[in-house]
Amino acid sequence: MKETADRETLEEILDLLDGMGMRYWIDGGWGVDIILGRQSREHRDIDVDFDGEYTDVLLKALEDKGYVITTDWRPCRIELSHPLLGYIDIHPFVIAEDGSARQADPEGGWYDLQAEWFSSAVFEGRKIPCISAGAQKPFHTGYEPREVDKVDMQNLDAFLKGQDKL
């Protein structure tokens, strides 16, 4: 099993998602790197937040590429793995007309997500939907941060401080 999701895999997943015509945003470590405009570290997986109405269609597309479900915590998240492409962690959202969204939490409640948290950034010449710089901190809560999460937040803090000086 491939233990990292590299830049080529990210491009392949982005092409798949773009071809589906659904709303999605890259989250997690790759989401931070997209905001930074550079890859700062290796990534275990690609986190994808998406319009939950496409859950079955997205799962079929991923399974058709050879991914298999390894963790199924529906409706919160589904993790899939591929022997050559690594891991992808998909998070179905319920998207409101105003652009805000909700994600089911594991205890049966909901996380409420503000419309302005959904953004995009340019990474290697490609405009990619992602969770905004300001929303990355709330998205990195609710669990014990790993060392890579702490580094991601430090990199994001440095990036945001640089933006304040522009």
Set out the residue ranges of the language-model regions:
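Helical scaffold of the NTase/Pol beta-like nucleotidyltransferase catalytic core
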Residues: 1-26, 154-166
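Short, acidic/polar N-cap/turn motifs at the starts of alpha helices
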Residues: 14, 75-78, 117-120
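Short amphipathic alpha-helices in soluble, non-transmembrane regions
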Residues: 58-64
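Conserved catalytic core of two-metal-ion nucleotidyltransferases
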Residues: 67-101
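Catalytic cores of NTP-dependent nucleotidyl/adenyl transfer enzymes across multiple folds
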Residues: 103-166
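Active-site nucleotide-donor binding segment shared across nucleotidyl transfer reactions
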Residues: 14-46, 51, 57, 132
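Anion (oxyanion) recognition and catalysis
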Residues: 18, 63, 122
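Short, solvent-exposed loop/turn segments at secondary-structure junctions
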Residues: 31-32, 95-96, 135-137
